[in-house]
Structures are given as structure tokens and as C-alpha cells.
Amino acid sequence: MNTRPADFSAVQAATSLTQFRSASPLVHCLTNDVVQSFTANVLLALNASPAMVVDPEEAAQFSAVADALLINVGTLERSRAEAMRTAVNSAHQAGTPWVLDPVAVGGLIFRSEFCRELLAWKPAAIRGNASEIMALAGLAAQGRGVDSADDSLAALPAARELARQVGTIVAVTGAVDYVTDGERDIAITGGDSMMTRVVGTGCALSAVVAGFCSLEGDRVSHVAAACYVMALAGQQAASVSQGTGSFIPNFLDRLYTLRAEDLA
């Protein structure tokens, strides 16, 4: 039986958020076409600087000077895969932390093989839903596109194993988020079901995780803090929204106004 880990401390989340806003990291996002604008707006709301440089040669140059890199394979095709390869290789050589969002891995062969190939370049973190994390770890999963039929707690053992195999941090997200480095587990509660009814909240979270990975200090705590901040903003935005149309601006507003004292 899986026992749920202890909840993440709001005080730790507040410390990481303060550090993040002060650092204003430059996050290079090679993400999917559906969520580029929303992802950029989420990063801007948190005082980060987003960049979407997609040409293979330029992507390699830019990832070496960015503070963090996001690889999201949601709308993967062969030319974009080449840009992602060059960017990840360049980031790896430069010591730039990069995050993998393995969208729909397990259900589709090309992206599944591609994401497993990228693991050789040692991502700082991997963020996915339960089905994606289980599939990337080599276990059977019940995914349907970007959705997951698996419970995040049920995927925690797979997340631990994946973290150990790759030497990374894994965030498996769902009704409760779990962050692990293979030895240490953290639970993050909050959020709202409305976050699953709009496009891009998970993809944007992966970009925020990338930015938080660029911070000095305890990276496991920083990844958990990224999940905590997004879940809290989602929960608070949903409480004042009539539906998904009003949720998105309320979510961005809450991220923009959220301060450490609101957390601690």
C-alpha cells in the first residue's frame, strides 16, 4: 500500500517564490503550439522572462545562455524534435537546467522513443501526469492523449524509480501532486478541478518548474514550490470564477499578485 508523503511546507514555498521573483529567470520554452501564449503569460505573471526560440541553430545558441530550458513534446514533429535535440545538448554542455514534459508518452511511438532518447542528457526535472510518468518509467499506464486515467499516488513508485534511473527530480501531478528525487517524497495539495478544464495549466506548470530549477539551493524543494504556487493560484482563482472563461484571467491575476506573505 502506498502511504502519502508529508505535505509541503508553505514557509518553504514562500521562500522559493521570493527567490524566484527576485531572480526573474529567463526560461527558454520549446513547447507545444497550443499553449505558447498561455505559458508565456504565466511566466510573466511570476516575474520570469519567457522566450520561444524554435529554429534549431538559434535554439542551441539560446539554451546555452538562458537560465532554464523547457522541452514539451505536445505537438512534436520531426523538425521540432531536431530543435529540441540541439537545445538540450547545448543546455547540457552549458550546465543549463532543463525540464522534460513528456506529453502523451506511452500512447504514441515517436514521442515515446524521442523522450527516452532525451533522458541521456539528464534533465533537472521531469513533470507529467501519472500515465506519462508510468509510461516513461516503462510501466503500463492508462493514458488517453494528454489525460490520465491513473492516480498520481499510484504512480509515485514509478516516479521514484524513474528519478533514480535518470538521476533527476520527478513531479507527478494530479489531484495531489508528488515530487520525488527517488529518496525523498513531497506531497502538494490544492488546485481545483477547473484547472483540468482549460488548456495549458500543466504545460505552464512545467515551464514554471524549469524556472524554479534555475534557483540556488534545494532543487527538490524548489520543484515542490513551483507546484505549490500554481496549485494555490488555481484554487484561489477558481473560488472567484463562474466558469472556465473567467478562470484564466483570474488565474493570471492571482499569480501576478501572489506574494510570499500570502503563503507563509
Swiss-Prot record:
<dbReference type="GO" id="GO:0005524">
    <property type="term" value="F:ATP binding"/>
</dbReference>
<dbReference type="InterPro" id="IPR000417">
    <property type="entry name" value="Hyethyz_kinase"/>
</dbReference>
<dbReference type="Pfam" id="PF02110">
    <property type="entry name" value="HK"/>
</dbReference>
<comment type="function">
    <text>Catalyzes the phosphorylation of the hydroxyl group of 4-methyl-5-beta-hydroxyethylthiazole (THZ).</text>
</comment>
<keyword id="KW-0479">Metal-binding</keyword>
<dbReference type="GO" id="GO:0009229">
    <property type="term" value="P:thiamine diphosphate biosynthetic process"/>
</dbReference>
<keyword id="KW-0418">Kinase</keyword>
<dbReference type="InterPro" id="IPR029056">
    <property type="entry name" value="Ribokinase-like"/>
</dbReference>
<feature type="binding site">
    <location>
        <position position="127"/>
    </location>
    <ligand>
        <name>ATP</name>
    </ligand>
</feature>
<feature type="binding site">
    <location>
        <position position="173"/>
    </location>
    <ligand>
        <name>ATP</name>
    </ligand>
</feature>
<keyword id="KW-0460">Magnesium</keyword>
<protein>
    <recommendedName>
        <fullName>Hydroxyethylthiazole kinase</fullName>
        <ecNumber>2.7.1.50</ecNumber>
    </recommendedName>
</protein>
<comment type="pathway">
    <text>Cofactor biosynthesis; thiamine diphosphate biosynthesis; 4-methyl-5-(2-phosphoethyl)-thiazole from 5-(2-hydroxyethyl)-4-methylthiazole: step 1/1.</text>
</comment>
<keyword id="KW-0547">Nucleotide-binding</keyword>
<comment type="similarity">
    <text>Belongs to the Thz kinase family.</text>
</comment>
<feature type="binding site">
    <location>
        <position position="200"/>
    </location>
    <ligand>
        <name>substrate</name>
    </ligand>
</feature>
<keyword id="KW-0784">Thiamine biosynthesis</keyword>
<feature type="binding site">
    <location>
        <position position="52"/>
    </location>
    <ligand>
        <name>substrate</name>
    </ligand>
</feature>
<keyword id="KW-0067">ATP-binding</keyword>
<keyword id="KW-0808">Transferase</keyword>
<dbReference type="GO" id="GO:0000287">
    <property type="term" value="F:magnesium ion binding"/>
</dbReference>
<dbReference type="GO" id="GO:0009228">
    <property type="term" value="P:thiamine biosynthetic process"/>
</dbReference>
<dbReference type="GO" id="GO:0004417">
    <property type="term" value="F:hydroxyethylthiazole kinase activity"/>
</dbReference>
